[in-house]
Regions:
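Structured C-terminal helix/loop/strand segments within mature extracytoplasmic catalytic/sensor domains
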Residues: 2-4, 47-76, 81-86, 91, ...
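Mid-domain, small-residue-enriched loop/turn segments at the edges of structured enzyme/sensor domains
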Residues: 1-56
Length: 151
């Protein structure tokens, strides 16, 4: 496919919906990038909220996206921090590259029956994947406990 055309569509979509801290500027691991990719935790949380509330595209498309997120097989970060039986719909991102370093990210809709919420934990330049995953799980646990106390 044509990366530039696809990136333009993604960036326009983000701008139209005021995800102003998100930009797709280069192919993943491009050898000589002329631009960069970035996203904020705030934009990620808004995106997940819009999907959960059915207000991102339309009810059917948003429901389909939610089902895809529920099917995530990497459950080593945010899902570790919530009690057994609490479902999550999450999207992870990870990178371990000699030049770019270690990145571990996870964003999720925590589908708790009494207090569903969204959470995004993004990292950059951490020492190891396992250390970052453990930290994300700890943050997730702390957030879950806080949200549960707000009933």
């Amino acid at each position: 496919g044509d990366f530039a055309a696809g990136a333009a569509v993604v960036n326009e979509f983000c701008q139209e919906r005021e995800y102003t801290s998100t930009h797709l500027g280069r192919e993943f691991l491009a050898k000589e990038p002329t631009d960069d990719n970035y996203v904020s935790a705030s934009d990620c949380c808004r995106l997940l909220s819009d999907i959960y509330n059915g207000t991102l595209v339309n009810e059917k498309a948003d429901s389909d996206m939610l089902e895809l997120l529920k099917g995530q097989t990497v459950k080593t970060k945010i899902p570790v921090g919530v009690p057994d039986g609490v479902k999550t719909a999450n999207k992870t991102g990870e990178l371990s590259d000699a030049k770019l370093g270690v990145v571990e990210n996870d964003i999720a809709i925590v589908l708790d029956a009494t207090h569903p919420y969204v959470i995004a934990v993004l990292s950059n330049g951490v020492k190891s994947n396992s250390e970052a995953q453990n930290t994300i799980a700890k943050i997730s646990k702390d957030v879950y406990e806080f949200m549960a106390s707000q009933k």
